[in-house]
Design a protein with these regions (language model features):
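Active-site gating loop/helix substructures
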Residues: 2-101
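Non-catalytic peripheral regions of patatin-like phospholipases
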Residues: 31-39, 43-44, 74-194
């Protein structure tokens, strides 16, 4: 399989968002490096398929990736048990490591970027038909509400970064978008209802 560092396009860096559950930290797989600030960066490259699988392992349905991995941090090498799960647990949009002027002491894959592309696999605006009365449905809607609020905060941050010229722009495609409300729909848009 293809390794992350083997994914190369001119001036393009790949970052796949995940969450390390033991330390409750962001875990980033990337073409530059992989790891989390608590453990450091992995000493070995990772398969793209493994990074994608870890990033998409929704905790309610799929198991986390549980491995002993070797890291390097501040020149020291150590092995840590690492439990990696869905990126949305810690940073649902995966943009926190892309914010300008991040400190690499507290985040991996820190890079200066001027344009951010983040994809959202959400359902769009709730239609109000849900009746979360019993415990399981209340818990699901609670998580959905937390994610929606986190998205709103991140959307606001991206708009402020653009308005202050800290980034040139951003693109936020998402599955739940209202295609009829797009200000400039592309001519080859595949509509949500198709």
């Amino acid at each position: 399989g293809t390794l992350l560092k083997g994914v190369k396009r001119q001036n393009l860096k790949i970052i796949i968002n995940a969450s390390e559950l033991r330390t409750q930290s962001a875990f980033r797989y990337g073409s530059m490096e992989s790891g989390c600030w608590r453990f450091g960066t992995l000493t070995e490259d990772t398969l793209v398929a493994k990074a994608v699988a870890a990033s998409a392992s929704f905790p309610a349905i799929l198991p986390a990736l549980d491995e002993q991995q070797r890291y390097i941090k501040r020149g020291e090498t150590a092995t840590h048990r690492t439990i990696v799960s869905d990126g949305g647990v810690y940073d649902n949009l995966g943009t926190s490591c892309l914010i300008p002027k991040r400190d690499s002491s507290f985040s991996t894959n820190v890079t200066e970027t001027d344009f951010i592309i983040a994809c959202i696999a959400g359902q769009g605006i709730p239609d109000g038909s849900s009746l979360p009365y019993f415990w399981p449905s209340r818990m699901i809607e609670t998580i959905n509400t937390i994610h929606r609020r986190t998205h709103s905060i991140t959307f606001d941050l991206l708009h402020r970064l653009k308005e202050s010229d800290e980034i040139k722009g951003f693109l936020l495609p998402y599955l739940g978008q209202n295609d009829a409300a797009l200000p400039c729909p592309p001519p080859d848009l595949v509509a949500r209802d198709k």
